C-alpha cells in the first residue's frame, strides 16, 4: 500500500477529522538527534475526541506509532510505515491545578510541569525539571531524575486504545518499575493526574535551579542528543561501564559518544540514524566484552532501516 492510497483510505474512513493529516512527512526535525526518515502518514489530532474517532475508523491492520517531543528517540533512516501520531496544541498541552492535584496533557514538557507545580507551591515534582521529555513519555517509561520518578507522584493516567475507546489507569494499573510501565502498548496517553504536597515556593524553585545546574554541568545539553542512552544495569552505572570499556569520545560516522558524559550519544553533524544506533550497538558490544554487563537501550528506536547503500 502506498502512502497516497493509505492517506486516501483514512480520509474516506474518517471524513470528519479536524486534525492535521500529512503524508511522507519528514520526522528528522521532530527529534532531538535531528535524524530519521519520513512518516508514511503523520496525524496530529485536534483533541481527544478527534483522536478517538481517528483510531476507531483506522483499519486495524495499519501500524500506529506515537512520538512526543522526540528527546528519547531514534527514528531510523527508512522512516515509519503506517501512521505516526504526534499530540500537540492546547488540547494536549495544558496544565490545570486544583489544590494538590495537577492535571496535565501528555504533550506538556516535563520541565513545564515542574514549573507549574512550583508556581502553585506544590512540592514533589521538581525532579521533572531535569527530564527533557514530555508527560506522555514519562508515563510510558516511568521517567525519573535526581532521586524522583513518575511513579512517586502519578495518581491516574488517561488515554485512547487502538479501538478508539477511552481508558483510565490507576497508579497500580500502570505497573511502574525502573524505566518501564506495564500499561498496554496500544494505548495513546492523553492526560495524567499527579499529586503534589504543599511546600515553600522559594524552596522548590531553589531545588529546581539545583537540578538545572547539575544537569548543565554534567550533560551535553547544548548538543544534538537524545538524553541518557542506556539504562543503568543492576549493580553498575552505565556511564562508568562505558568509560571503563574505552568508549568515551568513540566516533562512528557523524555520531560520537559524548566526552562530557559517556551515556550520551551526540550528532556531531551529518550523522544518520544508522550512525547513532550503530555506535550504540558498538558501545554495548565493548561493554559486554570488557565487564560482562549487558546494557539495554533507554532510548527508543523506531522505524525501518534505509534500503539505500
From Swiss-Prot:
GO terms for molecular function: FAD binding; UDP-N-acetylmuramate dehydrogenase activity. Its main location: cytoplasm. This is UDP-N-acetylenolpyruvoylglucosamine reductase. Its cofactor is FAD. Residues 34-221 form the FAD-binding PCMH-type domain. It comes from Methylorubrum populi (strain ATCC BAA-705 / NCIMB 13946 / BJ001) (Methylobacterium populi). SUPFAM superfamilies: FAD-binding/transporter-associated domain-like, Uridine diphospho-N-Acetylenolpyruvylglucosamine reductase, MurB, C-terminal domain. Its EC number is 1.3.1.98. HAMAP family: MurB. The gene is murB. One of its GO terms (cellular component) is cytosol. Pathway: Cell wall biogenesis; peptidoglycan biosynthesis. Keywords: Cell cycle, Cell division, Cell shape, Cell wall biogenesis/degradation, Cytoplasm, FAD, Flavoprotein, NADP, Oxidoreductase, Peptidoglycan synthesis.
Amino acid at each position: 500500500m502506498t502512502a497516497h492510497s493509505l492517506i486516501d483510505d483514512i480520509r474516506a474512513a474518517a471524513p470528519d477529522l479536524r486534525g492535521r493529516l500529512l503524508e511522507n512527512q519528514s520526522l528528522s526535525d521532530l527529534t532531538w538527534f535531528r535524524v530519521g526518515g519520513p512518516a508514511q502518514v503523520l496525524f496530529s489530532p485536534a483533541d481527544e475526541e478527534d483522536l478517538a474517532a481517528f483510531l476507531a475508523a483506522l483499519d486495524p491492520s495499519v501500524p500506529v506509532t506515537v512520538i512526543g517531543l522526540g528527546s528519547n528517540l531514534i527514528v531510523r533512516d527508512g522512516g515509519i510505515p503506517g501512521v505516526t501520531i504526534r499530540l500537540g496544541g492546547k488540547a494536549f498541552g495544558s496544565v490545570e491545578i486544583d489544590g494538590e492535584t495537577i492535571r496535565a496533557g501528555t504533550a506538556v514538557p516535563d520541565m513545564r510541569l515542574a514549573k507549574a507545580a512550583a508556581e502553585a507551591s506544590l512540592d514533589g515534582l521538581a525532579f521533572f525539571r531535569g527530564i527533557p521529555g514530555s508527560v506522555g513519555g514519562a508515563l510510558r517509561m516511568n521517567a525519573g531524575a535526581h532521586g524522583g520518578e513518575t511513579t512517586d507522584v502519578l495518581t491516574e493516567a488517561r488515554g485512547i486504545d487502538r479501538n478508539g475507546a477511552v481508558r483510565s489507569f490507576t497508579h497500580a494499573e500502570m505497573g511502574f518499575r525502573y524505566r518501564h510501565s506495564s500499561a498496554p502498548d496500544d494505548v495513546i496517553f492523553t492526560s495524567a493526574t499527579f499529586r503534589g504536597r504543599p511546600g515553600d515556593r522559594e524552596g522548590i524553585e531553589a531545588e529546581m535551579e539545583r537540578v538545572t545546574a547539575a544537569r548543565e554541568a554534567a550533560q551535553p545539553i547544548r548538543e544534538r542528543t537524545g538524553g541518557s542512552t542506556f539504562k543503568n544495569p543492576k549493580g553498575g552505572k552505565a556511564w562508568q561501564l562505558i568509560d571503563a570499556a574505552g568508549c568515551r569520545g568513540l566516533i562512528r560516522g557523524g555520531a560520537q559518544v559524548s566526552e562530557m558524559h559517556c551515556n550520551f550519544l551526540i550528532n556531531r553533524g551529518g550523522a544518520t540514524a544508522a550512525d547513532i544506533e550503530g555506535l550504540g550497538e558498538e558501545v554495548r558490544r565493548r561493554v559486554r566484552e570488557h565487564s560482562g554487563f549487558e546494557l539495554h537501550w533507554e532510548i527508543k528506536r523506531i522505524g525501518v532501516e534505509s534500503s539505500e547503500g
